[in-house]
Design a protein with these regions (language model features):
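Hydrophobic core of transmembrane alpha-helices in multi-pass small-molecule transporters
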Residues: 14, 95, 108-123, 319-333
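Short amphipathic helix-loop junctions that connect adjacent transmembrane helices
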Residues: 26-51, 248-264
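C-terminal ends and interior cores of transmembrane alpha-helices
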Residues: 90-105, 302-315
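Juxtamembrane intracellular "pre-TM" segments in multi-pass secondary transporters
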Residues: 200-234
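C-terminal membrane-cytosol helix-exit motif in multi-pass small-molecule transporters
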Residues: 186-205, 396-404
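C-terminal transmembrane helical hairpin of 12-TM major facilitator-type secondary transporters
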Residues: 294-338
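Cytoplasmic helix-loop-helix junction between adjacent transmembrane helices
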Residues: 112-152
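Helix-to-loop junctions at the C-terminal end of transmembrane segments
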Residues: 67-80, 279-293, 377
Length: 413
């Protein structure tokens, strides 16, 4: 029985974000916590080397995505969404299975291979978004893309919670650090089967266009070549870089500052996900009705930089849960208004090109902080990557406040 493609696509997005969420509670324990029973390095290994290796392992996925996602998008235009989506999901399933195997046999190279494979085939999200655009009428596009945000939220709430729960042997005796990844692999495999059997091709305008294998790098050069959008792109890059520092290393910070285990890290990130959804439901639209995007960004970027710093000052774990709603509010407002401002600044016929450029900027911005943060944590302290998140967000606010000038419609040269 065929189902409406939107619901299959939304399930795909939930699976994709759920897998990312599962990593949050587990990964810091594998390479960043010598006191964890899941620690994969020898007891005589330098703790700092684990931090650096942790950073490289986190960076592998977005670095591979930087090159592969534009290629998968082109393949979906050329051969259709269905085969590319199925291939991406199969790669995701195999990647999680290899990651679980790497934990079981204590093979760090296999963990890197697994994350690289998932990154190379990780075009699920971009192809899913294109599929929704294929089947959505213009007047329903905002509503259906809002469902994407809701699917993101579900994945980011359930993922960390499941990651902490399924890795806890006190819940079920045979649970371990590998269990969440076996579970994610099975879900992705089921989703692959669902796409193959129940998903109708949505791309009715398949075009045999030339392939550009280095589209990601070309997109970065293109961003610099559009003068009217440089400030927005630079702000987006810095914001995502700051968020990359935070999301990559906050679990490590929680372990060493407050002695959090997998379950407590999972509960914290699940709470952040709940706050993010509540922001989307109750705050974003109300603020958008009263203020323009530039007005919102001038206080939300400064707000998120300040709240990131506030995490460092928290005297007890309870304060983290108090700060999280404020952090999620400023973060959600910044994301929504940067996307809205970029969309309003270009003509409708080039929205696709601008979306591709933005995706490449985000992938590169997500790849750099783990590489840098591992060295920061190893040579200074585990708090330093969180401080770097705050400072990078502050620079994003400075750049936008000082350099941004409104444009009616950007001239694409």
């Amino acid at each position: 029985m065929k189902r409406h493609p939107i619901w299959i696509i939304l399930f795909t997005i939930v699976i994709d974000t759920l897998g990312i969420g599962i990593l949050g509670p587990i990964l810091p324990q594998l390479l960043g916590n010598p006191n964890s029973p899941h620690y994969l390095l020898g007891r005589d290994a330098a703790v700092g080397s684990g931090y650096i290796m942790f950073g490289f392992l986190v960076a592998v996925y977005p670095f591979m995505q930087f090159f592969s996602t534009p290629i998968l998008g082109q393949l979906s235009d050329r051969y259709g969404r269905k085969p590319v989506l199925a291939l991406s999901l199969a790669g995701t399933s195999l990647g999680y299975a290899l990651f679980a195997t790497g934990i079981v046999i204590r093979s760090i190279p296999l963990l890197f291979l697994a994350r690289a494979l998932d990154g190379i085939t990780g075009g699920n999200l971009s192809v899913a978004q294109a599929s929704i655009a294929d089947v959505t009428k213009p007047e329903e596009r905002t509503k259906n893309f809002g469902l994407i945000g809701a699917a993101f939220g579900v994945g980011f709430i359930v993922g960390p919670f499941l990651g902490g729960l399924l890795a806890d042997p006190s819940v079920v005796s045979w649970f371990s650090a590998s269990t969440p990844f076996w579970f994610a692999a099975m879900l992705a495999a089921a989703n692959t089967t669902q796409v193959l059997l129940q998903f109708d091709e949505t791309n009715t305008h398949i075009r045999h266009v030339p392939m550009h294998l280095l589209r990601g790098m070309a997109n970065i050069a293109r961003a610099y070549a559009i003068p009217d959008l440089r400030t927005i792109f630079l702000t987006t890059f810095l914001f995502n870089m700051g968020f990359g520092f935070f999301i990559s290393f906050f679990g490590l910070f929680l372990i060493h500052r407050f002695n959090f285990n997998e379950a407590r890290i999972g509960n914290f990130f699940a709470w952040v996900g709940v706050c993010a959804i509540l922001t989307q439901i109750f705050t974003t639209r109300r603020v958008a009705a009263r203020f323009s995007e530039p007005e919102v960004l001038r206080f939300s970027l400064l707000g998120v930089a300040s709240v990131m710093f506030a995490y460092l000052l928290a005297p007890a774990p309870l304060w983290l849960f108090v700060i999280a709603p404020v952090s999620s509010t400023f973060n959600g407002l910044s994301l929504a208004n940067m996307g809205g401002l970029l969309s309003r600044s270009v003509a409708p016929q080039v929205q696709g090109e601008i979306l591709g450029i933005g995706s490449s900027i985000q992938a590169l911005a997500n790849a750099l902080p783990p590489l840098m943060g591992g060295f920061f944590a190893a040579s200074l302290a585990t708090e330093v990557p969180v401080l770097a998140a705050s400072l990078t967000m502050f620079v994003a606010w400075l750049v936008f406040t000082i350099l941004y000038r409104p444009v009616r419609v950007a001239a694409l040269t």
